[in-house]
Amino acid sequence: MYNFKDSVNITVVSGNGGSGCVSFLREKFNAKGGPDGGNGGSGGSVIFKVRENLSTLSFYKNGHVLCAENGKPGMGFKRSGANGKDLTLFVPPNTEVYNENDGTLLYRLKNLNDEFVVLKGGRGGLGNWNFKTSVRRVPRFAQPGESGNSLSVRLELFLVADIGLVGLPNAGKSSLLNRITSAKSRVANYPFTTKIPHLGMLRRSYDDLIIADIPGIIKGASFGVGLGTKFLKHIAKTKILALVIDISEANFLESYNILLNELKSYSHKLFNKKKIIIANKLDLDGSEKNFDCLIKALGKEKVVGISIYENRGIDELIKEFFILAKTF
């Protein structure tokens, strides 16, 4: 699993145009031939393009300067210089390109093969043969190539998932993601094992669901405590919230209320999303009793009890995920 980056700042530079050539035709039987300097090639452009198999911006590093190729100068015999190669920068779907200087949204790259030319390369200069006239038969000058441009941009990737697994640290979100998808999210028995969102694909027949394991939320996250609001904005992009509760803990109801309060504090729109509550760790002592209490306390809320260790309730949960997804 690559490191997840939700935003990165880079500078892109388009290529300079090649200079026009000053040249005169010199042949065995034509010692004083006319001007024949060719045009310079165009500089390469900078293009952002969506690639299907990318899911993060981790390929790019903050502060990187990425340059397209310069055009080549013109040559004699009216030969044009080669154009500089375009610089194509591949990004995942749902990447937004901003002007870093003023924050303007330049383009939103959503779908496979979407592309955006952020900077065009400089034009090549004209060779001296272009400047020959009836009164100026021997032009001893040519145009320089047009300079390329540079731009500092911010790339932002919005994590888009059908279902977001939301819970306090160590609630079992990563283990659940690993169980129901082919993801390999890190699992350990200490808080904040998941420090970046992980995505997994849940497949069933002809249906696919993208499941996101969001880093653990703690009290005050909506105000920047813990991993803060950095990933709450990604939760806002998911269609359905799956609140994962460690049902073996004595304070399971408090955990549930903390999650709701943080979602509500961040935005009412987020709080009002469709939800399913997952009571995890039913295999541990006292969990069954707590599970019954949770169902009574939540009333009409949809609650599914599971044990990842015993593979219990997993099929029912997957079924509920697909049922909820079809309501959109």
Curated annotation (Swiss-Prot):
Location(s), subcellular: Cytoplasm
OBG-type G domain residues: 161-326
Matches recorded under PROSITE patterns: G_OBG, GTP1_OBG, OBG
Keywords, sorted A to Z: Cytoplasm, GTP-binding, Hydrolase, Magnesium, Metal-binding, Nucleotide-binding
Matching SUPFAM superfamilies: Obg GTP-binding protein N-terminal domain, P-loop containing nucleoside triphosphate hydrolases
Enzyme Commission number: 3.6.5.-
Cofactor (UniProt): Mg(2+)
Function comment: An essential GTPase which binds GTP, GDP and possibly (p)ppGpp with moderate affinity, with high nucleotide exchange rates and a fairly low GTP hydrolysis rate. Plays a role in control of the cell cycle, stress response, ribosome biogenesis and in those bacteria that undergo differentiation, in morphogenesis control.
Subunit structure, interactors included: Monomer.
Protein name: GTPase Obg
Organism: Borreliella burgdorferi (strain ATCC 35210 / DSM 4680 / CIP 102532 / B31) (Borrelia burgdorferi)
